[in-house]
Each structure stands twice: as C-alpha cells, then as structure tokens.
From Swiss-Prot:
The lineage of its organism: Eukaryota, Metazoa, Chordata, Craniata, Vertebrata. The gene is POC1B. This is POC1 centriolar protein homolog B. It is found in: Cytoplasm, Cytoskeleton, Microtubule organizing center, Centrosome; Cytoplasm, Cytoskeleton, Microtubule organizing center, Centrosome, Centriole; Cytoplasm, Cytoskeleton, Cilium basal body; Cytoplasm, Cytoskeleton, Spindle pole. GO terms for cellular component: centriole; centrosome; ciliary basal body; cytoplasm; spindle pole. SMART domains: WD40 (SM00320). Expressed in the retina.
C-alpha cells in the first residue's frame, strides 16, 4: 500500500455555482477549470492566485456537459435548451451556437485533433460537427432511447455511445455504421469513455457497477461493484493504469486496473458526485456534485511510474498508429468486490487561503445576433431531488436524492445580471433568430446543389470523353 505522501490530497475547492455541478474539464495546460451546472451557467476558474473567475451567462436551461478543445482555445458546452455553444475561454465570452438537436443535449466531445465535435442527445441520436467550418456533418441513429454520452476514440476512428436503452454502441466514423454493440439486462450506462490507448472502453453504470470492455475482441474484461449508489462518471488516468469513478453514494473511488482492485475511497462531497476528470498530465483531478462544490485534488500516487506510460500512450494518438497489442488489462473477465485493504481519505474541507478558493466572479453576458435567451424570472430547480432525478434512475437514487430528505433551498438569483437588461427587444431577437435559421437552411441547400452540380459536371465530362473515343474509333475503322 502507498505511503501517506503518495496518497491523493485535496488541494483546493471552489464555490460559485448555485446548483448541482453536472460536468467539468481541466484545460490542456492545467491552468484552468471549466464547470457546468444545473444553474444554467458555465464557469471558468483560473488557478493563478487571486485570479478572477468567469461566469458565462447564455444558456436557457441546465448545462449538461462542458469540454475544452485539445488546444484549449475553445470551450464547448451542451444544454437542455437543445443547443451547443462554442466559447472563447476568456473575459470576452464570444461564442457561436449550434441548434444541435430536437431534444436536450447530454454530452459534447472533441476529437483528439480538434477537427470534429460529437454531441449526444435525448432525441436518440449522435451528431458529428466540423469545427473548421462549424457545420453539421452527419448523424448516427441506432439507439432506441435517450443517448447519455458519446466519446471519440483517441485516433478518431471510432465513437462510443451509451443510452438508456441499456446498450453501448461502437461506431465507425468512416462508414458511419454501428460496428459493435454491448448490452446489459440490469441497468444502463450513465457515462462511457475510451482508455488512452483506444483498446478498451469503461462504463459507469446506473446499477452501481463499473465495467471495462476490450473493443478488439468484444469481451468484458473487468467488472467492479464497489459503490452503493449509481455510478455517474469515470475518468482514465493518462497512463491508462487507473480509473476514477464518481457515484451517487457521495464518494470517489480510484481503481488500479493493472491489479484489478480498489485502492482509494475519497470522501469530500456531501451528497451525490456527478462528475470527475483527470487533468491531461494526470497530476490533478477535479470533482463536482449536488453540494455545488468543485474539489481539486492532487493525484500523488504512482507519480514516478506514470510519466513514461503517459508518453507511450500519447504516441498512440497518431492517426496512423493502430491500437497497441500490449494491453494493460487481464485477459479474462472477473468481478471485483470492495476490499478491506483500501485507503479511505476524508479531508476536512478547509483550505489555508479561502480567498483563493472563492475568487471574485465576473459575469459575462453573451451578446450575439444569432442567438437569443429567455427573459428574467428564471427560478433554479432544487439542487437535490430534481438534479438527481435528471442524472439517475429514480429507483437507484441514494438517500440524499429522495423526496423525504430535507433539502436546502437554492440561493436567490437577483444578484446576477438578467437577460431583460438587454437593449434589444425580444421580438427583434426572435425575428433575427428566425432569419438566421432560414439562412442556415438556405446555405445547406446551396451546398447540396453545388455537390450535385459537381457530380453532374463530372458525369458530363465522362460522357464527352467516351463520345470522343467512340468517334476516334469509328474514324480509324473507316
């Protein structure tokens, strides 16, 4: 067992959201943290001492997912308002908006090269978008219920998705077809992702399980049941050797995938934990949940061994490199129960410099002629029962989520800038939005016509060439 100096430690915590944290992501350079919340806001936290935090105002409903682009120059967010927004992560808050789906959008994910964005929605579809042209490319339809998550493989050749239809599907991005399907008769996966080498996927189950699958041989490799509540999120360490899980039982757990066992149980949140993510280098990880707190942890464990493994896995991200055959996981499926010889860490939520943990917040309103937001008068849903009901199967809720639990009311929103402060009347913005939608449809129609015209010209050219060859042959015979 690791010594105390190698155990994870709580480094900082942040408070600024007024409702449950739904998603978070650390920037590629490790200097910023983006968080999404049930309060409809996106927040950007800077790790520099005394730096100001930014609160992005614009989404009309719960922000369900957030992710930095691979270069850190863009921030994508998904919302129950059926849109996806791309933000520039600075104080200007400039953004572009996709009218992405016909139902709430549950997840966003950039490809490793940053050229594509995958979105998953409750309209049962996955959509892929071009970031270069900022336009829709294609849809993937095979799920029969809400799609909760969709992730690119490290080489961009595959997409994995999970749905409330109790299936996990693997999609080929070249032919846009479903090439593999994993099903479960008990529960559905809340979250799914590829390991850094792209050879395996892991799923976070509503049935309290974590499963690891080999996508090359289509077999279940590992099965963990270490939580007492639904598992909401997972994150692979960049080395691929560790997996961290977030659960409605209020804990984070760290699994050693090489040895196939639980090594740490982290208790810091009060209530369900909805999201967790390692930094790109693996030295940090962050977590968020129903208590509205964002906790930043320092990893510490296996620090010496991870650097070489991380470099080896990063090399596999090249598009010409197939998955490495030296898989790190056991070859036969076997279940794992929680073991006694694990380390339990329950930090006191106290940081020496509280001012750093709760920095001043700058509200950034989104002004853009291509999008509109609702007027003031929004009320926040309760951060306990309703948030949990959205993320979890009601039958699998932890006691903190049940209606009988005493719930604290959310804070008043009157101190935040509201949309009614805009000088543009709502009727005008509605008209502008309608015009922009029609222009988008017109642009897509023109693009399709251009493609058809190109095909027609190519066919006509072939006909003329064949005709010329035929005339030449006739003249030679005569």
């Amino acid at each position: 067992m690791a010594s105390a100096t190698e155990d994870p430690v709580l480094e900082r915590y942040f408070k600024g959201h007024k409702a449950a944290i739904t998603s978070l992501d650390l920037s590629p350079n490790g200097k910023q943290l983006a968080t999404a919340s049930w309060d409809t806001f996106l927040m950007l936290w800077n790790f520099k001492p005394h730096a100001r935090a930014y609160r992005y105002v614009g989404h009309k409903d719960v922000v369900t997912s957030v992710q930095f682009s691979p270069h850190g120059n863009l921030l994508a967010s998904a919302s129950r308002d059926r849109t996806v927004r791309l933000w520039i992560p600075d104080k200007r808050g400039k953004f572009s908006e996709f009218k992405a789906h016909t139902a709430p959008v549950r997840s966003v994910d950039f490809s490793a090269d940053g050229q594509f964005l995958a979105t998953a929605s409750e309209d049962k579809s996955i959509k892929v978008w071009s970031m270069y042209r900022q336009r829709f490319l294609y849809s993937l339809y095979r799920h029969t219920h809400w799609v909760r998550c969709a992730k690119f493989s490290p080489d961009g050749r595959l997409i994995v998705s999970c749905s409330e239809d109790k299936t996990i599907k693997i999609w080929d991005t070249t032919n846009k077809q479903c090439v593999n399907n994993f099903s479960d008769s008990v529960g559905f996966a809340n979250f799914v992702d590829f390991n850094p080498s792209g050879t395996c996927i892991a799923s976070a189950g509503s049935d309290q399980t974590v499963k690891v699958w080999d996508v090359r041989v289509n077999k279940l490799l590992q099965h963990y049941q270490v939580h007492s509540g639904g598992v909401n999120c997972i994150s692979f360490h960049p080395s691929g050797n560790y997996l961290i899980t977030a659960s409605s039982d209020g804990t984070l757990k760290i699994l050693d995938l090489l040895e196939g066992r639980l090594i740490y149980t982290l208790q810091g949140h009060t209530g369900p934990v909805f999201t967790v993510s390692f930094s790109k280098g693996g030295e940090l990880f962050a977590s968020g949940g129903a208590d509205t707190q964002v906790l930043l942890w320092r990893t510490n464990f296996d620090e010496l061994h991870c650097k070489g493994l991380t470099k080896r896995n990063l090399k596999r991200l090249h598009f010409d490199s197939p998955p490495h055959l030296l898989d790190i996981y056991p070859r036969t499926p076997h279940p794992h129960e929680e073991k006694v010889e694990t380390v339990e860490i329950n930090p006191k939520l106290e940081v020496i410099d509280l001012q750093i943990s709760t920095p001043p917040v700058m509200d950034i309103l989104s002004f853009d002629s291509t999008t509109t937001t609702e007027t003031s008068g929004r009320t926040l849903p309760d951060k306990g029962e309703e948030a949990c009901g959205y993320f979890l199967n009601p039958s699998l809720m932890s006691p903190e989520c049940l209606p009988t639990t005493t719930k604290k009311k959310t804070e008043d929103m009157s101190d935040l800038p509201c949309e009614s402060q805009r000088s543009i009347p709502l009727a005008v913005t509605d008209a502008l939005e309608h015009i922009m939608e029609q222009l988008n449809v017109l642009t897509q129609t023109v693009s399709i016509l251009e493609q058809r015209l190109t095909l027609t010209e190519d066919k006509l050219k072939d006909c003329l060439e064949n005709q010329q060859k035929l005339f030449s042959a006739v003249q030679q015979k005569s």
